[in-house]
């Protein structure tokens, strides 16, 4: 480890066989997947709405947003992601751990990961490659998918 490394805490997530991470400051909380209120005419990626502390939070499938197959075994976890005053829920297969990573050594994402810009880059954690998500881009992508409510 380099003595001058700028280490950042990341919340390590698993979706199917893939590992993703969010900066810990962008992940408000992780909780068991509650019952969600469905929305009519919602896109397939929008699983429903959650009311938490008086705020309506749209909840999306990480499989659809990240274009990665999930396990879908009924043990999914809801991660509340924040960008400024906006919050969205992302349903993932598993929250693994909190890891430390030097984001200054982050590698560019593979072309197949570029999509909507939700992947900032890739870091190594042990023997795993971890795609680091851009919380702002995740929120932007999922909010853009919300149906227009009259």
Task: Please tell me what each predicted stretch does.
Residues 1-150:
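An acidic, low-aromatic, low-complexity terminal/linker signal
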